[in-house]
Amino acid sequence: MKMTFLQSLCAVVLCALFSMPALATPDLANGKTIDQQKCYGCHAKKSGFGNGDMIYTRSDSKVKSLANLKKMVALCNTELRLDLFPEDEADVTAFLNQQFYKFKP
């Protein structure tokens, strides 16, 4: 009986550990690649100047916090059907924050 309980407990703990992508270290290189392939072109059109980075650095930016940046990346992913996994969203968020926003975690 104890062995079954311990096995069940181990299984639950392992499942919990594998289901916590938010604790994983973001892959900045992947975030940059995704930004260049799936975000830059649309942002370049929206800026009106052909520079996709301008949307991140404009003075009237809607992004005022790291939490807001995460929401904006998720919104773009959903609305534009970019097919990004949650880990990819985290990578893009981390890249944009490091490159442009510099919000404290």
Residue spans of the language-model regions?
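C-terminal capping alpha-helices of c-type cytochrome domains
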Residues: 82-105
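An amphipathic alpha-helix signature
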Residues: 36, 66-74, 89-93, 97
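Residues at helix-coil transition
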Residues: 36, 44, 78, 97-101
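Long, charged/polar, soluble alpha-helical segments
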Residues: 61, 77-80, 86
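Bacterial N-terminal signal peptides that target proteins for export
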Residues: 1-10
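Gly/Gly-Pro-rich "capping" loops immediately C-terminal to redox-active cysteine motifs
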Residues: 28-32, 40-74
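Electrostatic cytochrome c docking/interface patches
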Residues: 19-34, 81
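Bacterial N-terminal signal peptides
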Residues: 9-19
